A protein has these predicted regions:
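A short, hydrophobic C-terminal helix/tail in secreted or cell-surface proteins
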Residues: 259-263
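Glycine/serine-rich anion-binding loops at beta->alpha junctions
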Residues: 76-117, 176-178, 182-185
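Short, small-residue-enriched loops and turns at beta-alpha junctions
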Residues: 47-49, 83-87, 114-116, 158, ...
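Catalytic cores of large soluble enzymes that bind and process phosphate-bearing ligands
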Residues: 14-18, 31, 48-55, 117, ...
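Acidic, glycine/proline-rich low-complexity segments that act as flexible tails and inter-domain linkers
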Residues: 1-88, 103, 258
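Active-site-proximal loop->helix
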Residues: 113-130
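Glycine-rich anion-binding loops and their surrounding alpha/beta cores
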Residues: 2, 10, 65-68, 89, ...
Length: 263
């Protein structure tokens, strides 16, 4: 059995947490047994030390354990970004999800309202008139019938309300929770396309996905700073296939050359 005092002392001494330690401290957060100041101290200490894959995996497993699941009968994909790139693009991943669904791919889209950008996937769908407050069975039905279902993160990860105040106090600084949204899909999507906020986070995300058993994934970050594949700059890519990490960098889909404005 671990304790908060042991965990925070280890982090302050710049020691990485094991998966079990990370699971314990994150589960304590989600259960509401830690105060806001204790949660903040852990998140800041993780940032100061530098987050490692075992910590991401431990936190992700704790989130997955208490999430409200969506059961699907076919393989599903998800495409999303971590957010936090500071560029404030429109919500590209939701557009990509629509195109994928229209081409016959089963998409289980996991998302939220905007936190660090102008528009989150939930904002797009809400403004389009979609009902975000669907039961897991209804989400599964949508996926089966129209190839697209949306899982509004606050409904499927209700324990996240226990860390909201601490995250808000730390903002605009990113925390380990920026990494967790894409890898805690309630439908357990085994095929994923994930954009990350910084090139330095690519291997962290890829290693975490492999440890969590994701069968296929692409992790990317564009060289103009977006958690997207850019049409203005080359994009660095890491592919995961059958638990093997394949580094393919850079990749180019340039349509415009600098200094073309992003808008």
């Amino acid at each position: 059995m671990y304790s908060f005092k042991e965990i925070i002392s280890s982090l302050n001494n710049k020691n990485d947490l094991s998966k079990d330690e990370a699971f314990f401290i994150s589960e304590s957060m989600f259960k509401g047994t830690l105060s806001d100041s204790e949660i903040k101290n852990v998140l800041v200490a993780l940032n100061t030390k530098g987050i490692c894959p075992d910590e991401v995996v431990g936190f992700a497993k704790a989130m997955r354990k208490i999430s409200t699941k969506v059961i699907t009968h076919e393989k599903v994909i998800d495409c999303c970004g971590t957010g936090g790139d500071g560029i404030n693009t429109f919500n590209i991943s939701t557009c990509s999800a629509f195109i994928s669904a229209a081409s016959g791919v089963k998409v289980a889209k996991h998302g939220n309202k905007a936190i660090t950008s102008n528009s989150g996937s939930a904002d797009v769908l809400h403004d389009a008139g979609a009902n975000l407050d669907l039961s897991p069975d209804k989400v599964s039905q949508c996926i089966n019938e129209v190839n697209f279902g949306f899982m509004f993160a606050p409904l499927h990860h209700q324990a996240m309300k226990n860390v909201a105040a601490s995250r808000k106090e730390i903002a605009p600084n990113k925390t380990i929770f920026n990494m967790l949204g894409p890898i805690t899909n309630p439908a357990n999507a085994q095929i994923q396309l994930i954009g990350v906020f910084d090139k330095s986070a690519m291997h962290l995300m890829a290693d975490s996905l492999m440890e969590l058993g994701t069968s296929k994934a692409i992790v990317l970050h564009s060289r103009d700073g977006m958690d997207e594949a850019s049409i203005y700059a080359e994009t660095d890519i890491i592919e995961i296939k059958d638990s093997v990490k394949i580094i393919n960098m850079p990749w180019s889909c340039l349509l415009y050359t600098s200094p073309s404005p992003r808008d």
